[in-house]
Amino acid sequence: MVYGELIYHPVVTKLLKFLDSSASREKLLRLLQYLCRFLTFYTFKRNFNIETIQLIKKIQSSIGISRKPLRFLKNLPHLKNLNKIYSNELLDSTLKIGDLIKNFGYALYFQFDTLQWLKLLGLLTSKNSGSLYFKIDKLAANFWLIGLTGSIITDLRNLKISYDSNKALLNEINSQNNNSNNDTLDEKLIEQNNDLILKNNEKINLNKRDLFKNILDSLIALKGSQLIDLNDGVLGFAGIITSIIGIEDIWNATKA
């Protein structure tokens, strides 16, 4: 009886569905990979023995390879989105530019991510790929940074749209409240506007959260692009935070 109640508990059911998704498994592996990256820095600074540091690095490398096949062909949805967004004449121009940059960057990022996988497996070598072999990692980081830049543009634009909408709604409410003729006071309209403001506030919080995540990921991409120099402690911590946010997003989207 207790066993049955546990197995069919809504949280357990949701957890099983969560773990059944390749996206959630990839995010969990990402969390472990960046945790290892942070621990490598921490153990080195704390003068741990070299065997411990090398073990953590080995685990980090193994997890990195394990993540690659879970992202295989992930560029295809972004290529599809490029065509859909480009054809959408009704989309806000700034959002359209941001989404095009985002999907262009991610499409090529995941393409080079696949090449990184082939490189790690030894199927792609300097002999059969020439100078590209030595540029793959940097190019992948470059296109990831481009994708993140597009995401940041859309986040900022969505924030402005929501703030402007709230401002207009508040002005309308104040206009109704300040009307000297109480008979014309539209309580229903005010209530509707308040509901819209609450919905906009929810969007604002989500956009701020996404913006924070994209900025942290940009630090990792900037390091990979060799545009800034940050230690593994900072990068590992940034990766841990963004991985947790990604896991939380997938968990919230999973239906029990």
UniProtKB/Swiss-Prot annotation:
Gene Ontology BP term (one): peroxisome fission
Keywords, alphabetical: Membrane, Peroxisome, Peroxisome biogenesis
Effect of residue 68 to T: In strain: S2
Main location: membrane
Keyword Membrane appears in the UniProt entry: yes
Membrane association type: Peripheral membrane protein
One Pfam family per UniProt: PEX11
Localisation: Peroxisome membrane
GO cellular component, one term: peroxisomal membrane
Listed PANTHER family: PEROXIN 11, PEROXISOMAL BIOGENESIS FACTOR 11
Function: Involved in peroxisomal proliferation. Could participate in peroxisomal elongation or fission. May be involved in parceling of peroxisomes into regular quanta.
Family: Belongs to the peroxin-11 family.
Name of the protein in question: Peroxisomal membrane protein PMP30B
Gene name linked to the record: PEX11B
